[in-house]
Amino acid sequence: WTKKVPVFQLQKFVSGVEVAVGAFFNGKDFILPINVNFEHKRVFPGDIGPFTGEMGTLMFWSEPNRLFHMTLEKMKPALVESGYIGYIDINCIVNGKGIYPLEFTARFGYPTIQIQSEGITMPMGEWLYKLASGENFELKTKKGFQVGVRINVPTLFVKSTDKETIEMYRDLPILFKKPDSLDGIHIEDVKIEDGSWRVAGVSGCLMVVTGSGTTVSEARQQVYT
């Protein structure tokens, strides 16, 4: 194993809730509101199945809160010094004893950005241009919660050398119960041939389906219907 993993880090396990807080940064300050999100990493609902990079996320927009003040906000001087512009979040384990930061993500998250677009009511090009220009503005967002669910096929779990599985799902058609209503559908490895949606590529990641609601149950129901 020393050849495959020459260096590894042993970390102390902390039991708690995994939660991330993120915000867009214009080079000088954070753009409000902030984003609080909870990733779902196992392949099936109910924490069933193997771990994936991410199968979906629940999120909401908020004014700066304790989690933000104790973690991400402390990075402001370093972000200003580096001239950073973009999205940044920090993932943490939170329990009754405190907040334990895990890692930073200094880029758009996937499928985080698709789910955020469900909750942001401003045109995407408008707020991205303002952000890149270093403007100070407030994001217009929906109240309540947004949920995103990633739709995959089994090629997500195989190596590129597994030709049998890859061929099994190559170019398969993708059908919708309501083909005239595609709100909340964010495509990934999908192509259109002769008017039909089909599986493209070998990543196994087809699309992200998003929904929103004043409660988590409402947002989840919109995604699945």
Region roles according to the model:
Residues 95-99, 106-109, 152-156, 192, ...:
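Short, glycine-/Ser/Thr-/acidic-enriched flexible segments
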Residues 209-225:
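Short, well-ordered alpha-helical segments
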Residues 69-88, 105-182:
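Active-site "cap" helix and flanking loop/linker of ATP-utilizing ligase/carboxylase catalytic domains
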Residues 165-208:
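Generic long, charged, amphipathic alpha-helical segments
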Residues 1-116:
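Internal nucleotide-binding/catalytic subdomain
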Residues 44-46, 136-138, 191-198:
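Short beta-strand/turn micro-motifs at beta-sheet edges
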Residues 12, 23-25, 151-153, 211-213:
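Short beta-strand-to-loop capping motifs
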